[in-house]
């Protein structure tokens, strides 16, 4: 049976009780077995849509459902627990994300696996590393524990790619005052990862029309494609909140 890992989150109502009920419901499903769960950890919210802290955790499932069928089960369980999908990063009683489904890589209209943000979000990686430390991330080709450890290295090296040096400098100026502990730089200015020491923690590709750099040219582990987002500053702040402002 395939091994799957899911993330649990919530900040409305009795979240611990909601987690317990959700896991009980999953374990009662004839095609789902809950193998192991992490500790629950309290984390700061991302964005400014809510100020209430979240409870987060992870669970290891053994299933005989397809990825798409499992997603539907998770979404139905969220709805049954009162989840309403209206505001991104908003308050919610229960959030269930499918992180990994064996070593499958899925890119469909309704489902992306591995979860595209699971490799750099501390509120996902910390609990997930408790129960899946040696599991290989199928895209990054390194373990969950190693992905988490990369985020702990100081100074935190954050590289912007896919912008002209002038565009990158303006964006860095906007970001530096908010995150003075982060070392920001431009890929186009540096020239390559070899000139950035230590290895960048994250390389965010913004894919401006003026860029001569392709996303596929960037190092595999730290690269993150944000080219589809309109507000670069806001999106990068959300990424940094997820990677840095853990608790």
Can you describe what each PLM-predicted range is?
Residues 2-8, 12-88, 93, 102-103, ...:
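Nucleotide and nucleotide-moiety/phosphate-recognizing core
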Residues 38, 46, 53, 71, ...:
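Flexible, gly/pro- and Lys/Arg-enriched active-site loops
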Residues 162-176:
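Redox- and metal-dependent alpha/beta enzyme cores, enriched for Fe-S-associated oxidoreductases
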């Amino acid at each position: 049976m395939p091994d799957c890992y899911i993330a649990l989150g919530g900040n409305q109502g009795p979240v611990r009780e909601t987690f317990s009920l959700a896991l009980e419901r999953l374990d009662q499903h004839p095609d789902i077995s809950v193998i192991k769960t992490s500790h629950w950890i309290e984390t700061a919210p991302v964005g400014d849509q809510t100020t209430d802290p979240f409870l987060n955790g992870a669970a290891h499932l053994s299933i005989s459902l397809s990825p798409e069928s499992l997603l539907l089960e998770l979404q139905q369980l969220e709805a049954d627990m009162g989840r309403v999908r209206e505001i991104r990063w908003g308050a919610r009683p229960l959030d269930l994300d499918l992180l990994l489904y064996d070593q499958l890589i899925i890119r469909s209209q309704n489902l992306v696996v591995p979860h595209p943000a699971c490799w750099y979000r501390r509120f996902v990686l910390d609990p997930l590393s408790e129960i899946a430390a040696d599991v290989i991330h199928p895209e990054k080709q390194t373990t969950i524990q190693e992905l988490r450890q990369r985020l702990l290295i100081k100074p935190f090296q954050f590289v912007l790619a896919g912008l002209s040096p002038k565009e990158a400098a303006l964006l860095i100026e906007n970001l530096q005052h908010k995150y003075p502990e982060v070392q920001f730089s431009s890929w186009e200015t540096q020239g390559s990862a070899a000139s950035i020491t230590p290895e960048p923690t994250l390389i965010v590709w913004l894919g401006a029309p003026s860029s001569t750099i392709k996303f596929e040219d960037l190092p595999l582990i730290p690269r993150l494609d944000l080219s589809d987002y309109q507000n670069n500053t806001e999106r990068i702040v959300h990424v940094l909140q997820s990677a840095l402002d853990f608790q």
